[in-house]
Amino acid sequence: MSQRLTLEDVRAARERIRPSLPPTPLRPSLAAPGVDLRLKLECWQPTGSFKVRGALSLMSALGEVERRRGVAAASAGNHALGVAFAAQCLGGALPTTVFVPASAPQAKVAKLRRFPVDVRQVGETYDDTVESAEAFLGETGATSVHAFEDTRVAAGQGTAGLEVAEECPDVGMLLVPVGGGGLIAGVAVAAKALVPGVRIVAVQPDASPALRESLALGRPLLTYPARPTLADGVAGGIGEIAFAHRDLIDDVVVVTEAEIEDAIVALLSEDQ
């Protein structure tokens, strides 16, 4: 499977997810006076995160044989909820197993159990959990729903960029948070195809600048020894799919913990 996405891939993903995930709002922000800054409110997704786009995109694209074998994912956060919600959207007919660390908060595990999925708490660390999930995939032939290393997932994440470009065709810059990079790969493909002059700017915490360092080295750092950060959801290594789309990324901005704190306060006080 090619690691490069096309606009057609993103549009096809939108058709798959559209029945369950309508577009999220694009709203002006009051947090940056004098700047036409708009927020793509992915917090309005049913699971509170854009991750559900990619999970549903992949899971709804499976053929009959793949569906019988089921899917599995390892996650301690938003991706797990996205996979669980996608399973519900598909009527519970797709056997879905979600692996979470034994140390995962019980409130989060309880939320996952509300969906038609088999939740398995395995391993003391996230790496242990991933190892268990990989063993399960090998034993069962289930399809892996990776958080970012699958073009069907990245295409699903890219539907957010498609919505922005269609709603705001004069957009000059998109600021995209980057962890593994599935979001920026999909968003960049869609936005650049529809708005050729748009600048795609990756944003990472200085506790985990894996993309910046990968670009400097000329190879993706698949794992990265991130320091503790408020933006823990984007900590860690960069994926191969994201790195394959590095030509579409115009700049990488690295922010400090103090800047992240200031941004959170500004958003809460000005944009609620």
Q: PLM features: what roles do these ranges have?
A:
Residues 1-272:
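PLP-dependent amino-acid enzyme catalytic core
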